[in-house]
């Protein structure tokens, strides 16, 4: 055992391996910059950060938009309606954007007979509110603290239904994204959480490939234990960005895979396959009592295409359940569009049809001239802006 070093010779003690001696700049800094251990941690982080930047990674987007090219852009589930519909939209300004909308519908089980909505948006704030003839109120508010942090609030109040409140926080870094949200959160006197909490993380590992996971915790009753699950996510974008693949392995055993393809300049195609694993109880044919369980796998596939032209947009889908659907949006005038959608279920011998009109009006002279394809001086525009 070596003898202890006298205090007078403390300066002769060698430095710890892998720790560089303090520089003159570090010795004049604060505790974290002058401390050798914290300095080593900071140097290691800088090296890792420099290596990540050399990989040329990009932001992978959010988990919510993992397969938006297929589910939102190509497929028509976001646009389909039944019955007759008329939309009257009026834009008052472009920056900041302020717009109101009146929606009338007849013969639809999903849409209310009348709904009014207002929208306001600028560089940092987005606010939208809706109210219908049944006095059901809904609204959402997005506020960007900076380019990376966005806070979101969704609220829905309906007669005869429980109130829904969702709080959400988005963080978009250069090569990853984090999202945390909670639905109807509440805490008891004992500090027990009830509601739904979801946290997701998506990280780019190469310029084309991103991997992530999503965790969910749900507890509706304070006396019962909560449920938790983890879903695994992946997204791959080709170098030319002409096709995108995304996959999800959800906590309930569902496997979802989708593929988006840019066929031509104005043609897009997408396919999505869902496999659901489950358990079916087996009962005794004579007694009717359960005697076991049997694993089952159910699946469905949907194929869709989108044709976008200068004055019209066409979407069509075909799935393995025998449903064929289409949606057509035709701009007859700069301020008038005609909507048509239809669906045929061959297995159930059922059909659905929807027709609608969409009017765009301007709240001032400048916007009116823009809708007519003219600038402030009355000269034709090269491209008609989208209001």
From Swiss-Prot:
Highest taxon above the source species? Eukaryota
- Which residues, if any, are the signal sequence? none
CDD domains associated with the record? Porin3_Tom40
Q: Where in the cell is it found?
A: Mitochondrion outer membrane
Q: What is one GO cellular-component annotation here?
A: pore complex
Q: Name one GO biological process term.
A: monoatomic ion transport
Q: Which keywords, in A-to-Z order, does the entry hold?
A: Ion transport, Membrane, Mitochondrion, Mitochondrion outer membrane, Porin, Protein transport, Transmembrane, Transmembrane beta strand, Transport
- Tell me the Pfam families matching this sequence: Porin_3 (PF01459)
GO MF annotation terms:
porin activity; protein transmembrane transporter activity
Membrane protein topology class: Multi-pass membrane protein
**According to its UniProt record, where is this protein mainly located?**
mitochondrion
What family, per the record? Belongs to the Tom40 family.
Question: How is the quaternary structure described?
Answer: Forms part of the preprotein translocase complex of the outer mitochondrial membrane (TOM complex) which consists of at least 7 different proteins (TOM5, TOM6, TOM7, TOM20, TOM22, TOM40 and TOM70). Interacts with mitochondrial targeting sequences. Interacts with FCJ1.
Entries under PANTHER family matching the protein: MITOCHONDRIAL IMPORT RECEPTOR SUBUNIT TOM40 (PTHR10802)
Q: What does this chain do?
A: Channel-forming protein essential for import of protein precursors into mitochondria.
Return the NCBIfam families for the record.
3a0801s07tom40
Which protein are we looking at? Mitochondrial import receptor subunit TOM40
């Amino acid at each position: 055992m070596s003898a202890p070093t006298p205090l007078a010779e403390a300066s002769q003690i060698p430095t710890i391996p892998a720790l560089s001696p303090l520089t003159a700049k570090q010795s004049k800094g604060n505790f974290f910059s002058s401390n050798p251990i914290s300095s080593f941690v900071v140097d290691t982080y800088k090296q890792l950060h420099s290596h990540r930047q050399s990989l040329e990674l990009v932001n992978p987007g959010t988990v919510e938009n993992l397969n938006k090219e297929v589910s939102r852009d190509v497929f028509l589930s976001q646009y389909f309606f039944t019955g007759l519909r008329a939309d009257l939209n009026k834009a008052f300004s472009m920056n900041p954007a302020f717009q109101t909308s009146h929606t009338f519908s007849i013969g639809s089980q999903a849409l209310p007979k009348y709904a009014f909505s207002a929208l306001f948006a600028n560089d940092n704030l987005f606010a939208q509110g809706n109210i219908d003839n049944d006095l059901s109120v809904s609204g959402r508010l997005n506020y960007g603290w900076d380019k990376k942090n966005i806070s979101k609030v969704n609220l829905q109040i309906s007669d005869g239904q429980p109130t829904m409140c969702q709080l959400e926080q988005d963080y978009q870094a250069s090569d990853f994204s984090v999202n945390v949200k909670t639905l109807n959160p509440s805490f008891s006197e004992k500090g027990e959480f009830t509601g739904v909490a979801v946290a997701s993380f998506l990280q780019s590992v190469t310029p084309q490939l991103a991997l992530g996971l999503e965790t969910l915790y749900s507890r509706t009753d304070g006396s019962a234990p909560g449920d938790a699950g983890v879903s695994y996510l992946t997204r791959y974008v080709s170098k030319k960005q002409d096709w995108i693949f995304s996959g999800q392995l959800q906590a309930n055993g569902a496997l979802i895979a989708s593929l988006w393809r840019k066929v031509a300049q104005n043609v897009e195609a997408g396919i999505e396959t869902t496999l659901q694993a489950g358990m079916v109880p087996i009962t005794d044919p004579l007694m009717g009592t359960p005697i076991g369980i049997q694993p089952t796998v159910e699946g469905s596939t949907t194929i869709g295409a989108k044709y976008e032209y200068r004055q019209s947009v066409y979407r069509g889908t075909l799935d393995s359940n025998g449903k064929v659907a289409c949606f057509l949006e035709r701009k007859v005038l700069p301020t008038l569009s005609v909507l048509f959608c239809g669906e045929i279920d061959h297995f159930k011998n059922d059909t659905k049809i929807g027709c609608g009109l969409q009017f765009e009006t301007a709240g001032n002279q400048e916007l009116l001239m823009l809708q007519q394809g003219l600038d402030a001086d009355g000269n034709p525009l090269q491209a008609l802006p989208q209001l």
